[in-house]
Amino acid sequence: MNFVTTLTYLLPHRMLSSLARHIAYCQHPLIKQWLIDTVIAKFDVNLSEAAEPDAHAYPSFNAFFTRSLKAGIRLPDPNPDTLLMPADGRISQLGPIREGRIFQAKGQSFTATELLGDTAAASAFTNGLFATVYLSPRDYHRVHMPCTGQLLKTVHVPGRLFSVGPDAVRQIPRLFARNERLVCHFDTAFGPMVLVMVGALLVSGVETVWGGVEIPAYGDRITHKDYQGRNIAIERFAEMARFNYGSTVIVLLPPNVFTLAPHLTAESPVTLGQALAHRLSLNHSTQAPTQEK
C-alpha cells in the first residue's frame, strides 16, 4: 500500500467532504472560476459536449460539475433488449457474481450482501452479473437508467468515504462495501435490478430525480425508504441520479437473463447509452468475461 493510500485511512473523510460541499456551492466569482479552470486543465474536460460550453457561465463549481450534455450527444443503443451503460466513465470491473462475491481487483472482492446491506435482497443476484463504472472528475456526472424500471426502495448504507480512484480500488480491501452508498432497487421487465451510487472522498452529495439530495446527511445506521405504490417509473436512458463529484456506480443484474457485451473488459472507456449487456435467448447460456485472479 503506497503512502497516499495509507494517508486516506487517517483523513477525516466526512469533514473534508462537507468542506468540499460548501466550496462546490460557493458562488464567489474568483473562487468558483479558479476551481473550474483548474479541473478543466488538470483533467482535460471536454466542454464542447456540454449544453453550456462556456466555462464562465456556471454560477458555481457544482453547477459545472453536474452539467448537462447537448441534446443528441449521447444516444441509447436502439435494440430494446440491450441494457444500456448508465454513465460515462471507465469499467473498473465486471463479470459474474460468483458464490455471492463481487470482484473488485486482483486479490480483492466483497459480498453482494455487504454491498446492499441486505441478505434477502442480495440473494436475487446470486450467480447474476455486475458492472462497476468509475466516473473520473472529467466525466459527465449524471447516471441514467439501463432499462425502464419501477423504483421499489432505496437503502442508505453508512460508511467511510475513501477515494474510489484506481489506486485505492487496487489497495483498499472491500472498498465499495465500506464506503457510504445509496442502493436503488428497481423492478424491470427483465427482473430485479440494482444501481448502487457509491460515495467517495470529496463527493459532496448524491442526488436522485425522485428524492433530491440523498447524501448528505451522512448516516450512522442503515436507512430504508419504501417507494412501492408511489408509481415512480423511470424510462430507459432517462436520468435517475447524479454525483456532485466523481465516484462510482455499480449495476447488479439477475442470473440467466443477460450476457455482458463481449467487447467490455476492465479499464474499458465507456459512454452513456452504449451496450452494457444483451438479453439471452432461451437456448443461450450465460457467458462472462475473464477476470484477473
Curated annotation (Swiss-Prot):
PTM section of the record: Is synthesized initially as an inactive proenzyme. Formation of the active enzyme involves a self-maturation process in which the active site pyruvoyl group is generated from an internal serine residue via an autocatalytic post-translational modification. Two non-identical subunits are generated from the proenzyme in this reaction, and the pyruvate is formed at the N-terminus of the alpha chain, which is derived from the carboxyl end of the proenzyme.
GO MF annotations in UniProt: phosphatidylserine decarboxylase activity
Cited HAMAP family: PS_decarb_PSD_B_type1
Main location: membrane
Quaternary data: Heterodimer of a large membrane-associated beta subunit and a small pyruvoyl-containing alpha subunit.
The protein's name in its UniProt record: Phosphatidylserine decarboxylase proenzyme
Pathways per UniProt: Phospholipid metabolism; phosphatidylethanolamine biosynthesis; phosphatidylethanolamine from CDP-diacylglycerol: step 2/2
Gene: psd
Localization annotation: Cell membrane
Reactions catalysed, as given in the entry: a 1,2-diacyl-sn-glycero-3-phospho-L-serine + H(+) = a 1,2-diacyl-sn-glycero-3-phosphoethanolamine + CO2
Keyword terms of this UniProt record: Cell membrane, Decarboxylase, Lipid biosynthesis, Lipid metabolism, Lyase, Membrane, Phospholipid biosynthesis, Phospholipid metabolism, Pyruvate, Zymogen
Active site annotation, chain numbering: 88 (charge relay system), 144 (charge relay system), 247 (charge relay system), 247 (schiff-base intermediate with substrate)
Cofactor binding note of this UniProt entry: Binds 1 pyruvoyl group covalently per subunit.
A Pfam family per the record: PS_Dcarbxylase
EC code: 4.1.1.65
Assigned protein family: Belongs to the phosphatidylserine decarboxylase family. PSD-B subfamily. Prokaryotic type I sub-subfamily.
GO biological process, one term: phosphatidylethanolamine biosynthetic process
Organism for this UniProt entry: Xylella fastidiosa (strain M12)
Gene Ontology CC entries for this record: plasma membrane
Cofactor: pyruvate
Chain positions of site Cleavage (non-hydrolytic): 246-247
Membrane topology: Peripheral membrane protein
